[in-house]
């Protein structure tokens, strides 16, 4: 085999170690080159202004007001709708700082649906959203304790209850009401808290599933505003905490915030 080496040519016997080395070097070099091109083209898409800095904190707590926290979420969702690439701080330094403690600015009660990823919807990064998830975004003892922990111990200024378009748990609750459907295992018990919202939404005009999802959100918001422990109620009375509802449109990516106070 004849191989060009710079300006000269070498005759290498077939199967020789030198030939294997040459092939390996060529293949590895090609792979590295392709990787470099891919990496450079990928990172070229990340404009400096797209890198999202973590929300401000002081003494291990968020310094944002409830309205400032909500404004960050609204801004992030608008960027998501515009297909803007927003890169949060994922550096080793950021990870190391979070190992010492977290200071989220929002507690999120949302559905377990895989199509509803809060950090992506709002362009936020590590340690910024304290997320409580279950099918149907309901609040049982475990969820309530998690929310109260986020408020009392972590000092979040905002709690958002997020329902979404075409929620399977709400559809299941509707089938119980309309068809007396039954589900195996613990699913029946899981959707039971959603049934009152389905019943209340039946008389509302418009899409019955969307109405039921929003009514379910409103019921949870009402509980968190009025029927929870003083550790939740006191910061709301002192305007250090807000609890609001939201609805996510799967098809467009838009999040509508409602029942604001």
Task: State where each predicted segment sits.
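N-terminal secretory signal peptides
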Residues: 1-21
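Twin-arginine (Tat) signal peptide motif
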Residues: 19-27, 41
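Divalent-metal-activated hydrolytic enzyme cores
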Residues: 27-34, 46-101, 126-127, 136-145, ...
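Short hydrophobic alpha-helical membrane-anchoring segments
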Residues: 37, 41-45
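Glycine-rich, flexible N-terminal cofactor/catalytic loop recognition
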Residues: 93-106, 111-116
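Short beta-strand segments
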Residues: 109-111, 133, 160-164, 244-249
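Active-site cofactor/substrate anionic-group-binding motifs, chiefly glycine-
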Residues: 112-137, 142
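Gly/Ser/Thr-rich loops at beta-strand to alpha-helix junctions
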Residues: 114-115, 164-169
